[in-house]
Amino acid sequence: MRVFVTGGSGFIGNALVRRLRREGHEVRALARSERAKAMVIETDAIPVRGDITQPGSWQDEARFGDVVVHAAALVSDWGPRREFYRVNVDGTKNILDGLKKWDGHFIHISSIAVHGFRPGAYTETSPASPDRHPYCDSKAEAERLVDMAIKEGLQASLVRIAGVYGPGDPHFIARFLDQVRSGRIFIVGKGDQPSNLIYIDDIIEGLILIAKRKCEPGQRYVLSHPSAPDVLSMVQYALKGLKLRARVQPVPIWIAVAVASLQEIRSHLAKSRPSLTRYAVKAMGNRCVFSTEVTAQKLGWSPKMSVQEGVARTISWYRKISPSRRPSTTPAQHS
């Protein structure tokens, strides 16, 4: 295959490019900075300089591919709505504009966040129902743009991904360790809510399977672990893997939301980032359940990595890298 990937320096995009190159596919990846360019070169793929938020010659380069995987996004629990829309919506529009009258397979990486945080069971066919957070709204709007392009003839699939973690993960372990160092870990609610996570290798396997099969325009897939443990179990796995102890303190969701609201007010006044956001609280207390039944049937896909083993491998990776190369705790990534 010839594949063009946006977000080639991001967590998912970079892992995908590496896997594609190992399999011998021709890959070009969009890189918006010299650092991103260097990361793409490390994978043995061809970097294409450009930014999805700015139309340019990279749009013609995207047509090189038999498959285009749109992995670039701004992912964060905090930030101006205009910035989420600039990257996630306008960026998607730019890549779609470049692919008009192109006859390849477009794979749009979306998120289970398009459903917001309303408790319930969701399937691949459940419509987006965002929760007024700019990240959720922007991902839902990006899906709408893809659906419009499909009506105009684009061959496109959409992939809703759960919370991703694994070696190379920019946030998961770093943020967790911040709490451990304080001696206390706060969890929203009783901790019996599903963790809704998926290991990076399982995501990449799913994306490869989608890329290799004939496109069913408009088909949505969900990549999530169907038997992921609850949040409290996740915390216990991580503490065990780190060989650390910390007091686990459940906090009622209404209290957590109130604290986060105050943090956000202070941050707006101080023009700084809050240590806790309402989005993070709702995500941690999320009681949504996601079915992957259709995805499994169509792709023959199922997660190979248990969450317990996945957490252990992530911790092992984190311990091996030097402190200077460890990721920051700021959960924002525009790749």
Where do the language-model regions lie?
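Amphipathic terminal alpha-helices
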Residues: 290-297, 302-335
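Conserved Rossmann-fold NAD(P)-dependent oxidoreductase catalytic core, especially the SDR/UDP-sugar
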Residues: 90-134, 157
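NAD(P)H-binding glycine-rich loop region in Rossmannoid oxidoreductase-like domains
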Residues: 39, 45-90, 98
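NAD(P)-dependent short-chain dehydrogenase/reductase
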Residues: 149-195, 200-202, 209, 238-239
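Mid/C-terminal beta-alpha module of Rossmann-like enzyme folds, strongest
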Residues: 213-275, 308, 312-315, 325-328
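N-terminal Rossmann NAD(P)H-binding glycine-rich loop of SDR-like oxidoreductase domains
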Residues: 3-23
